[in-house]
Amino acid sequence: MRGTAVRTILRAACAAAVAVGVSGCMTVPTGGRVHAGSQASQDSQGGRNIQVPAAYAVEGLSPKDVVGGFRLASAVLSNPAIARSYLADPTWQPTEGVHVIDESGESVVYAINGDTATVRVIDKWVGTIFTDGTYQPQPNGATSDVTYTLTKSAPQSKGEWRISKLPNFLVLDRTEVENAFWQGSLYYLSPGGQFLVPVRVFLPHTATDVATALVEQLSQPVPGWLAHAGVFSALPQTDQAPTVTVSGDVATVDLPPPFGNLNAIERDQASAQLTYTLVRSGVASQVRITVGGAPLPNSRQAVTQTLKTWSAFDPDVLRTATFTYIDDAGVPRLANGAPLLSPPLPEPTATKGTGTAAPGPRPRFVSAVVAPRLVGSSGPDLVAGVTRNPDNTQTLYAGPINAVVPVLSAASFSTPSWDLLGNVWTVEQVSTGAQEILVGVVTPTTTPKFQRVNIDGTLASSLIVSLKVSRDGTRVALVVRSTTGSQLWVGRVERSDRGVTIGGLYPVAPNVQPAADGVAWASATSLAILATSSGSEIVTAWLVDVDGWDATIQQVPFDASSLTAAPNQPLAIGTKSRQVEVLNGSAWQVVVDGGTVPNYPS
């Protein structure tokens, strides 16, 4: 609709002989942080994404041109009068968020019947910005199918075609979203209050004070998707607006009186939320927090606070640790070649035909993952690993690094995954083909006990080949395989009296097909993916935001087969030729010969 229709509008409005078409070929959103801008952008795709300024409705437009003009004007949030000039009812308000589209997929059907007309526009639908400002992608192949009804008989129409019926959401392409919205990050708290949980939000450029808008949102209900995971805010909900003033690199947040009633723990939690939200959103590098002009006390005795002040809440600030890998003999080792387990697993005994006992083959590991640890944490490291048995079944081991024990046996287990609370997750496959997602708490002194995890209907009958839990324990990334290939999904962890459920599933990077051991949480906000693109056999590494909005590509060796990532650590891959390579700057460096399946603590 932003091609022929836009050209016609510009001719009518400006009597111009030439205008630029904008029927661009968009892809899965990969843009960076949003900055204020006009309705124009540099085009790196041969002129396909050039934006044309929106114009007020004029006389003589066809129904198709009216709809095209309205959709273009919808992106000018700073001047809604332009979009409303195409409407029979200028009081219309969008109340259901934004459908983000790929403009290359549009098709238009329209019909006229007297003084009434309909225009149906079908676009490739890549995602939705919800009313709480959060974004989620749509499955590959989704369409946004919208019908607009137009009339010439409404009083406001004055005999011209104007839209009388339309959906209560905006339809914008990615470039329009980036020009119309700021992007910021809100930080909430995990169910136990130990860790910060981030979420990206889109704020209209009409919100002139972005810092205040971000802080106000922290005092409103938690976005629905995260709320179902038990995520909460320590800032009490209030109708009294905080004020934020920024001077140099310091943001001063003055909170209303209810915040003075927070207890000591809540003050620390609220301070961490405010500091991370404002600093990570680029508002300031230091934060000062007051209530009615008086400092809000905190346990750090900090007047101005930085990310370092509250790093204990950050699940990405981990004790330095290297990756583990599995050598050619099936022994798990540290990156320097030292054995991971001390002592190693004992050799099982087998009975000869004479009845005498003899050593059996030691179990061969196929994966081993150390639990992540926060800076300053004490106690022995925990580890979980999977061995392949002589009968081709597998056994899951877990426990402290010096005393792992067998926990479960089945046909197979996915590579284990840990959160920072000592919960280890895996997917168990039994000989009949049935599968169960399992989670168990591992401590240095108790035998792990696992419970079954439910999953909502979206993937209830799908084959899950990989599960990776976020270090804050609130989200999981799943690789699901079907007859058409593999797909990455993200879900939230819901805990209740009825048990643990994975819900709220949505696809991430739907155009790529990840490897089973090719997904890792690179940080609390991003996933690293080893995958092939649709229609290609070339393996590539992708760094994708957990909401699917941003993505960057990293070339990898042609025979890469597994991947691991961790905050502030270089990307590492295992290859089919049984080498482990790490990304050193822009080049891949072989660091292990005769090993594979590297895993950072995660």
Curated annotation (Swiss-Prot):
Cellular component aspect of the GO annotation: plasma membrane
Membrane association type: Lipid-anchor
Main location: membrane
Domain of life according to the entry: Bacteria
Covalently attached lipid (N-palmitoyl cysteine), positions: 25
Pfam families associated with the record: Germane, Gmad1
Subcellular location: Cell membrane
Stretch forming the signal peptide: 1-24
SMART domains: Germane
Lipidation (S-diacylglycerol cysteine): 25
Keyword annotations of the record: Cell membrane, Lipoprotein, Membrane, Palmitate, Signal
Region (Disordered), start-end ranges: 338-362
Comp. bias regions, Low complexity: 348-359
Entry's family note: Belongs to the LpqB lipoprotein family.
Name of the protein described by the UniProt record: Lipoprotein LpqB
